[in-house]
């Protein structure tokens, strides 16, 4: 493989340790390590309970996770398009490992699916098998080659998902699992070359005599096999020599995944300015910047002038005091007439109808909130605890349970658009469904189940509606108290446990001291894992666990220690926290509206303070649809893909819904209506028009870019670096045609350059500090849409009209604009954009 190219100076970059002086760079793994025989995984069930009384109910046969929706997909534009390899910003960089040579001398038959080769007394479990229905499912960026930094998407394509399933193989991407697989291969080759039979022992219970005898191999073949075996052993030694002894093996995968994500984000950021914004958002939110990420600041010409933030005036308070607690009084008459679902409501029948889907994926939590009088968290929490019989198992008084639930829900902020009690109820219900996954049946103890549900319920309590970085940048008391480390997550834990000390709120009062300590430790671990900056570490831990079991001979995930068990539980709650894109589309779109409203509200606060506005928080520039596509491609899909491997085939429907939703948002970008020629002259005159840019370039569009590029014109980057050069602006216009989806990017950059040259217009008053009701629409109230934005688009969101490709309109405009600067009347075919991109909306 070719060495990686040096990253662009303007791209996002990871500060990763390079090789020591005099040390050669690590070789890429042997090609066959990309593919290993598909090994079924079984999660061993427990045979005990830690509750006071062992009364295990009769368990129903295994069944897949049910979906609560029955959505007609006929009107989804995304489902009618050809499904592509994703992420869309980088169309394949793999080397097509399916053609590489593989040596499979040791791979014998798989064990019986009902019994562990290591433990004859193990309970029957669910095995991980390849499903024919999933053979066409696309794979995440984690399955791209780690070494192909400089391969062009024009010349490379990768269809590994189809090939791997067709050959019954798994793709192995975590370094430690690759080392294990390589050592097994070396062992097999050694046996073949020396005619030494492989003993049937615990290292190779599946093995047997090699399927190929040395006598049947030619001398040349034996020499080649020996060389390849030696090279593979050298590669293993090199990997082990560079492993840092004080770090876990999963950190090798975390290090690799972050490097690969950085490469993907670099490609995305180079596509357009909005692509750079999406990249910056993902990098800032989901990578632990404190130690590993270094993002270059904008150049002086790019950074707008901003007033320094005003000095914060705050009342001094003891640092040991937990903020956000309220003195609430809930009547003690709750234990007299306990409502059926824990909350008083006049629509109990409708609520009961909705809660029939409590154990199904895709429960409409918005309807539950409406029928429960806005008490969705209390309703869901009480109903789940009753259904799982946790009140009896842990002797939780009903009135105490109800008092704590109501107190907890009251400490969620109803005026926060997304991180409110509705989100907590959704995560709680999603965790409940994931705990009921057939593959995890009888795996976790009652105490672990209680801890997971409690962690989901409190994981965002007293959330202020701003990010950790905002609190750090504003020197908030919370950031000072928790030393800038997982600020909000630590606060949620403190509030959640502190509320147990309120009157008649201690739902764990009858737990033993040991149970209480164990539960607290688990809850802390799970809630801290909801810090999105820890995402790549969590993903690497889980994927290393799954792939290590795939390449071992047993294929049994024992989960026989705290570290392994809490690792699965942490990822479960993390998956539930990132489950919005996997829900039915109508629910997903509502969640998207809410999270964008919260982002925009934070952006308004940052603008008021004169701070730099966080990525995706500026309502004038954020591209909602593209942010969701990038969010799915780089964050949600790799996580759920790995979870689906763990519990296969139980999460296949969830992956299908995720793919459908991603296609819908992608199609919403491509199918938005174009502005009419009559509207175009006024586009640049509207200072409130959002900057929205297309971040995806298809292969055809890139070819078009090459063919339509005007010789002698400066590149986009050079033009942007000279904002006051009006001639450069005019020359930039003639290059837009080749990147037609990014037309508005250039238009808006020119608009900003013009504004900076003539003095930026006074900023209009926007909705700041807006309060949101859980039952009302969110985004439409943020600002008044301009006429060009009122074209049909996503419900409650600005239209994508300015972004969509309209070649015919452009061609007509080009012919009418032959007088533009930098073009000539006899060469209208190479004019790049309509005349509206000229200064003042008229041809230059």
UniProtKB/Swiss-Prot annotation:
Give the enzyme's EC designation. Answer: 3.1.4.53
Its pathway is: Purine metabolism; 3',5'-cyclic AMP degradation; AMP from 3',5'-cyclic AMP: step 1/1
Binding residue positions for Zn(2+) 2: 460
Q: Where in the cell is it found?
A: Cytoplasm, Cytosol; Membrane
Q: Which positions bind 3',5'-cyclic AMP?
A: 419, 628, 631
Query: Modified residue Phosphoserine is at which positions?
Result: 13, 147, 152, 160, 204, 333, 672, 674
Q: Where is this site: Cleavage?
A: 69-70
Q: Which parts of the sequence belong to the PDEase domain?
A: 343-672
Q: Which residues bind Zn(2+) 1?
A: 423, 459-460, 577
What's the protein called, per UniProt?
3',5'-cyclic-AMP phosphodiesterase 4A
Originating species: Mus musculus
């Amino acid at each position: 493989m070719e060495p990686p190219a040096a990253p662009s100076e303007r791209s996002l970059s990871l500060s990763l340790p390079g090789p020591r002086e005099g040390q050669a760079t690590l070789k890429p793994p042997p090609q066959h390590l990309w593919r290993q025989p598909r090994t079924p995984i079984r999660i061993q069930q427990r045979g005990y309970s830690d509750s006071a009384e062992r009364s295990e109910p009769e368990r129903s046969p295994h069944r897949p996770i049910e979906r609560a929706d029955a959505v007609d997909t006929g009107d989804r534009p995304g489902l009618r398009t050809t499904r592509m390899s994703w992420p869309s910003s980088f169309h394949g960089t793999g080397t097509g490992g399916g053609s590489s040579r593989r040596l499979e001398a040791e791979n014998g038959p798989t064990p019986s699916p009902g019994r562990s080769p290591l433990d004859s007394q193990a309970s029957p479990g669910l095995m991980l098998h390849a499903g024919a229905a999933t053979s066409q499912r696309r794979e995440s960026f984690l399955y791209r080659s780690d070494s192909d930094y400089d391969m062009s998407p024009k010349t490379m394509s990768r269809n590994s998902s189809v090939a791997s399933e067709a050959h019954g193989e798994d793709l192995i991407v975590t370094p430690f699992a690759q080392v294990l697989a390589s050592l097994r291969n070396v062992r097999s080759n050694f046996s073949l070359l020396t005619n030494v039979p492989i003993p049937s022992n615990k290292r190779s219970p599946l093995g047997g005599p090699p399927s190929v005898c040395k006598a049947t191999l030619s001398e040349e073949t034996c020499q080649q096999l020996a060389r390849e075996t030696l090279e593979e052993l050298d590669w293993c030694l090199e990997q082990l020599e560079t492993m840092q002894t004080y770090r876990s093996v999963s950190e090798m995968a975390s290090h690799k995944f972050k490097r690969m994500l950085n490469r993907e984000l670099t490609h995305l950021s180079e596509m357009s300015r909005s692509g750079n914004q999406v990249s910056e958002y993902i990098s800032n939110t989901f990578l632990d910047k404190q130690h590993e990420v270094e993002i270059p600041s904008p150049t002086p010409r790019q950074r707008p002038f901003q007033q320094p933030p005003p000095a914060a005036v705050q009342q001094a308070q003891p640092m040991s005091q937990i903020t956000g607690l309220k003195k609430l009084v809930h009547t003690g008459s709750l234990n007299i007439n306990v409502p059926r679902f824990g909350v008083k409501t006049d629509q109990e029948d409708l609520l009961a109808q909705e809660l029939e889907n409590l154990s199904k994926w895709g429960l409409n939590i918005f309807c539950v909130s409406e029928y429960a009088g806005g008490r969705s968290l209390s309703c869901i929490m009480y109903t789940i605890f009753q259904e799982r019989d946790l009140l009896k198992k842990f002797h939780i008084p009903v009135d105490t349970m109800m008092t704590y639930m109501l107190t907890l829900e009251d400490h969620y902020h109803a005026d926060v658009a997304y991180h409110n009690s509705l989100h907590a109820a959704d995560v709680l219900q999603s965790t409940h469904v994931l705990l009921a996954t057939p593959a995890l049946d009888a795996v976790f103890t009652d105490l672990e189940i209680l801890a997971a549900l409690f962690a989901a319920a409190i994981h965002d309590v007293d959330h202020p509606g701003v990010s950790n970085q905002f609190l750090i940048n504003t020197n908030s008391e919370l950031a000072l108290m928790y030393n800038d480390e997982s600020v909000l997550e630590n606060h949620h834990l403190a509030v959640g446990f502190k509320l147990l000390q309120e009157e008649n709120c201690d739902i764990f009062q009858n737990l033993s001291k040991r149970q209480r300590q164990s539960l607290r430790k688990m809850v802390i671990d799970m809630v801290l894992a909801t810090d999105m900056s820890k995402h790549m570490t969590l993903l690497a831990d889980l994927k290393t666990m799954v792939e290590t079991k795939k390449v071992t001979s047993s294929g049994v995930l024992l989960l026989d220690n705290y570290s392994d068990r809490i690792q699965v539980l942490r990822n479960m709650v993390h998956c539930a926290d990132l489950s919005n894109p996997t829900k039915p589309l109508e629910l997903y779109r509502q969640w998207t509206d809410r999270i964008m409203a919260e982002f925009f509200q934070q952006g308004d606060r940052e603008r008021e303070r004169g701070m730099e506005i966080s990525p995706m928080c500026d309502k004038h520039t954020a591209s909602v649809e593209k942010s969701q596509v990038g969010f799915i491609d780089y964050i949600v899909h790799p996580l759920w893909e790995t979870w689906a491997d763990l519990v296969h085939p139980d999460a296949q429907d969830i992956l299908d819904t995720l793919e459908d939703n991603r296609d819908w948002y992608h199609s919403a970008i491509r199918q938005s209506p174009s502005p009419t020629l009559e509207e175009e002259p006024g586009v640049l005159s509207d200072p409130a028009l959002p900057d929205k840019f297309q971040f995806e370039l298809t292969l055809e569009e890139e070819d078009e870019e090459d063919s339509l590029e005007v010789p002698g014109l400066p590149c986009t980057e050079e033009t942007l670096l000279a904002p006051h050069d009006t001639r450069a602006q005019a020359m930039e216009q003639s290059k837009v045609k080749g990147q037609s989806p990014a037309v508005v990017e250039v238009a808006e950059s020119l608009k900003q350059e013009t504004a900076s040259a003539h003095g930026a217009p006074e900023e209009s008053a926007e909705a700041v500090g807006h309060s949101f009701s859980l039952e009302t629409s969110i985004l439409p109230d943020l600002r008044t849409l301009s006429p060009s934005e009122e074209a049909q688009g996503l419900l409650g969101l600005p239209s994508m009209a300015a972004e969509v490709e309209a070649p015919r309109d452009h061609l007509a405009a080009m012919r009418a604009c032959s007088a533009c600067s930098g073009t000539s009347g006899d060469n209208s075919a190479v004019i790049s954009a309509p005349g509206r991109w000229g200064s003042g909306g008229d041809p230059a």
